[in-house]
Structure formats: structure tokens, C-alpha cells
Swiss-Prot record:
It is found in: Cytoplasm. It comes from Bacillus velezensis (strain DSM 23117 / BGSC 10A6 / LMG 26770 / FZB42) (Bacillus amyloliquefaciens subsp. plantarum). It holds the Pfam family SepF. The keyword Transcription regulation does not apply. Cell division protein that is part of the divisome complex and is recruited early to the Z-ring. Probably stimulates Z-ring formation, perhaps through the cross-linking of FtsZ protofilaments. Its function overlaps with FtsA. This is Cell division protein SepF. HAMAP family: SepF. Residues 21-56 are annotated as: Disordered. One of its GO terms (biological process) is FtsZ-dependent cytokinesis.
Length: 152
């Protein structure tokens, strides 16, 4: 047998092989077909037991706003923890030295950036820090003295 015929026989089936091929039908083995019907992929199966449904009202009740008036830089981490727990924080920096207040604002700016939140100045030395689940709409305009504006 030539090499050409060997390759031809290897890659294609001869007509003789078709004669011996037998196709099974559902009538030949009905019990196997029923077992296959019972086995469904995991995504096609219906959930069994208790379904976890959360009321939308309970989600809204858990939203909180925390008021914070830090006296030292070390309290900035506590404010960051509130933000990580998805709570909005109003930070009053009026009772802290300017250099410490600036460090706190820098720290909180990094925190809200990391969690996808936002920080906004809402007053003189007062900031609103929000996580990504809180939307703030509107703006507060104020007349700022040149001295106050240069401070930040």
C-alpha cells in the first residue's frame, strides 16, 4: 500500500466502515435518557430552599452620617475606618492646628480616592467625605476672605 493510500485511509472513513456503524436511539435505552434528563447543569437548576431576599428599606436604614471633630492627627484613621465601612463623615477641623488639619485632609483625600468616594469642602474648615455608595448633589457657595482662601 502506498503512502498516499495510507494517509487517505487514516483521515477518511471508507464506505465499509459506515456499514458497521450503529446509531443508538432513545428507544434502545430509555432508562439512560431519563437519567440524563434529571442531570441538569448547575446554572439551569432552580434554587432550592430559602431564597435570600433583602428588603430595599432595610438597606436604606443602614446608611449613616458620622460627625467628627478630630483634635489630633491620629484620629484620622478612625475617620478612614468609618469611610471603609461605607458611612459618610462630616469632618470639622476648626479645633486643630492648621498643619495638622492639612495632614488630615491629605490622608482623607487618599482614603476616599482608594475607596472610590469623594471629599468636598462644605464650610470653613469643614469637609464632607463620602464613600462610593453616597451621592451628594448641589453645592454650597460662600464668600471666602482672601486669608481663608490662601489657608487651603
Amino acid at each position: 500500500m502506498s503512502m498516499k493510500n495510507k494517509l487517505k485511509n487514516f483521515f477518511s472513513m471508507d464506505e465499509e466502515e459506515y456499514e458497521y456503524e450503529y446509531i443508538e436511539t432513545e428507544q434502545d435505552h430509555p432508562e439512560e435518557h431519563e437519567q440524563q434528563k434529571d442531570k441538569q447543569p448547575a446554572y439551569a437548576q432552580k434554587p432550592q430552599g430559602k431564597q435570600n431576599v433583602v428588603s430595599l428599606q432595610s438597606v436604606q436604614k443602614s446608611s449613616k452620617v458620622v460627625l467628627s471633630e478630630p483634635r489630633v492627627y491620629a484620629e484620622a484613621q478612625e475617620i478612614a475606618d468609618h469611610l471603609k465601612n461605607r458611612r459618610a463623615v462630616v469632618v470639622n477641623l476648626q479645633r486643630i492646628q492648621h498643619d495638622q488639619a492639612k495632614r488630615i485632609v491629605d490622608f482623607l483625600s487618599g482614603t476616599v480616592y482608594a475607596i472610590g468616594g469623594d471629599i468636598q469642602r462644605i464650610g470653613s474648615d469643614i469637609f464632607l467625605c463620602t464613600p462610593d455608595n453616597v451621592d451628594v448633589s448641589g453645592t454650597i457657595s460662600e464668600l471666602i476672605n482672601e486669608d481663608e482662601h490662601q489657608r487651603w
